[in-house]
From Swiss-Prot:
The lineage of its organism: Bacteria, Pseudomonadati, Pseudomonadota, Alphaproteobacteria, Acetobacterales. Binds directly to 23S rRNA. The L1 stalk is quite mobile in the ribosome, and is involved in E site tRNA release. One of its GO terms (biological process) is regulation of translation. PROSITE patterns: RIBOSOMAL_L1. This is Large ribosomal subunit protein uL1.
Length: 231
């Protein structure tokens, strides 16, 4: 009941028909984040793309200037010295066939998966499990790499991965309600800038169509896309 009252009060605070300036939207999303935990602030971007076409896919990995406020659990497929390097860098789970067996058994104790190139034949067999969860290592995202230390460190320091869904919408957590407003603004601008730079060649017409902010338990707050440089 308290949850419903909070949501109703938050919805009454937000004008759903208004597109707010970025600073105002940030202040509002922080104001309505009244849960008893530190809510995640999420951004949603509606893009003028059709991800069903290969030349219109938008996907990437970005290190936010102020981190996300969340510590990712990192899993690494590696052997020998590279496995030791991963552990030393702070990876949560490291292994080869033993880790693959755990994944096949449903034990997926990581939020980001990294692999050395020689492990991809093994990891490839886990595609049906890792793929739908967005955990499949990808060389384009820097998660298939010999620089295991760098990849683990980056993941632990506030990297966010983004990928357009079928409707051309991208969601990403860009901080916590406890963040200062200017820190959230820096993260948001960095994220939107990265998405704009990732504009695919096949995209036609207006690319960045809509933007919104929300907290874990709060309503969506529309953001005026003119707050961001045209992309």
């Amino acid at each position: 009941m308290a949850k419903n009252k909070r949501l109703t009060a938050a919805q009454a605070t937000v004008d759903r028909n208004k597109a707010y300036g970025l600073d105002e939207a940030i202040a509002l999303v922080k104001q309505v984040a009244t849960a008893k935990f530190d809510e995640t602030i999420e951004i949603s971007l509606n893009l003028g793309i059709d991800p069903r076409h290969a030349d219109q896919m938008v996907r990437g990995l970005l290190s936010l200037p102020n981190g996300t406020g969340k510590t990712l659990r990192v899993g690494v497929f590696a052997r020998g010295a590279k496995a030791e390097e991963a552990l030393a860098a702070g990876a949560d789970v490291v292994g080869a066939e033993d880790l693959a067996e755990k994944v096949q058994a449903g034990e997926i104790a990581f939020d980001r998966c990294i692999a050395t190139p020689d492990m991809m034949a093994l990891v490839g067999r886990l595609g049906k499990i890792l793929g739908p969860r967005g955990l499949m290592p990808n060389p384009k995202l820097g998660t298939v790499t010999m620089d295991v230390k760098g990849a683990v460190t980056a993941a632990k320091s506030g990297q966010v991965e983004y990928r357009a869904e079928k409707a051309g919408i991208i969601h990403a957590g860009i901080g916590k309600a406890s963040f200062e407003g200017d820190k959230l603004a820096e993260n948001i601008r960095a994220f939107v800038d990265a998405v704009q730079k990732a504009k695919p060649t096949g995209a036609k017409g207006t690319y960045l169509r809509k933007a919104a902010l929300s907290s874990t338990m709060g309503p969506g707050i529309r953001v005026d896309v003119s707050a961001f440089s045209a992309g």
